[in-house]
């Protein structure tokens, strides 16, 4: 069975992974993954469909019980997960969704503050079905950060949103992470999204990390910056995308 994530001691890395493997029946999904993520670092994970991205995130979150696996996996005790589907409980109000597990006046105050941070002040008593898709993801972000996690895991959180809403959510996530300073692992198919947000970008291919790229661009990122374009070309090549006049790596 897959090992449960261990708890990190204070002043260590937010994520420590060594030789991580995961298998489903006879198929190897993760094959000897090594990774460290520093406290407060924003890391994006790219890869083609079936490369093992979501399996890796679920392993970090401790959500892969019953899956065969080996390796060392250490994460902080306080972590939150955001998925593409906001996964709000339809029978609870917005603030009730945000404050699940929190009690008393302090919990309500923390919930109101979290909703204000994501631009939803005054929507505390709304029902999830009264919100747009983008607003539902804002609630999911508020819920994930209300407990000040040391690690935020995000699995394609904006994949179902339209292009304009995605850009707005990029700005919001950047602001929230700068304020709360969790370590972040963002799983995405969107190369530009990864470059726009991350300090480092990883590429996973057939269960192995084949790229670990530091993004040394000022924020907010300018898509017209020639260096942005160069990072895009390099990453697309590692993802097997052939560009005119170039061969994929």
Curated annotation (Swiss-Prot):
<keyword id="KW-0614">Plasmid</keyword>
<keyword id="KW-0547">Nucleotide-binding</keyword>
<dbReference type="InterPro" id="IPR017871">
    <property type="entry name" value="ABC_transporter-like_CS"/>
</dbReference>
<dbReference type="InterPro" id="IPR050166">
    <property type="entry name" value="ABC_transporter_ATP-bind"/>
</dbReference>
<dbReference type="Pfam" id="PF00005">
    <property type="entry name" value="ABC_tran"/>
</dbReference>
<dbReference type="GO" id="GO:0005975">
    <property type="term" value="P:carbohydrate metabolic process"/>
</dbReference>
<dbReference type="GO" id="GO:0004553">
    <property type="term" value="F:hydrolase activity, hydrolyzing O-glycosyl compounds"/>
</dbReference>
<dbReference type="GO" id="GO:0005886">
    <property type="term" value="C:plasma membrane"/>
</dbReference>
<comment type="function">
    <text>Part of the ABC transporter complex SsuABC involved in aliphatic sulfonates import. Responsible for energy coupling to the transport system.</text>
</comment>
<dbReference type="InterPro" id="IPR003593">
    <property type="entry name" value="AAA+_ATPase"/>
</dbReference>
<keyword id="KW-0813">Transport</keyword>
<dbReference type="GO" id="GO:0005524">
    <property type="term" value="F:ATP binding"/>
</dbReference>
<dbReference type="GO" id="GO:0016887">
    <property type="term" value="F:ATP hydrolysis activity"/>
</dbReference>
<protein>
    <recommendedName>
        <fullName>Aliphatic sulfonates import ATP-binding protein SsuB 2</fullName>
        <ecNumber>7.6.2.14</ecNumber>
    </recommendedName>
</protein>
<dbReference type="InterPro" id="IPR027417">
    <property type="entry name" value="P-loop_NTPase"/>
</dbReference>
<keyword id="KW-1278">Translocase</keyword>
<keyword id="KW-0067">ATP-binding</keyword>
<keyword id="KW-1003">Cell membrane</keyword>
<keyword id="KW-0472">Membrane</keyword>
<keyword id="KW-0997">Cell inner membrane</keyword>
<dbReference type="InterPro" id="IPR001579">
    <property type="entry name" value="Glyco_hydro_18_chit_AS"/>
</dbReference>
<feature type="binding site">
    <location>
        <begin position="47"/>
        <end position="54"/>
    </location>
    <ligand>
        <name>ATP</name>
    </ligand>
</feature>
<feature type="domain" description="ABC transporter">
    <location>
        <begin position="15"/>
        <end position="231"/>
    </location>
</feature>
<dbReference type="InterPro" id="IPR003439">
    <property type="entry name" value="ABC_transporter-like_ATP-bd"/>
</dbReference>
<comment type="similarity">
    <text>Belongs to the ABC transporter superfamily. Aliphatic sulfonates importer (TC 3.A.1.17.2) family.</text>
</comment>
<comment type="subunit">
    <text>The complex is composed of two ATP-binding proteins (SsuB), two transmembrane proteins (SsuC) and a solute-binding protein (SsuA).</text>
</comment>
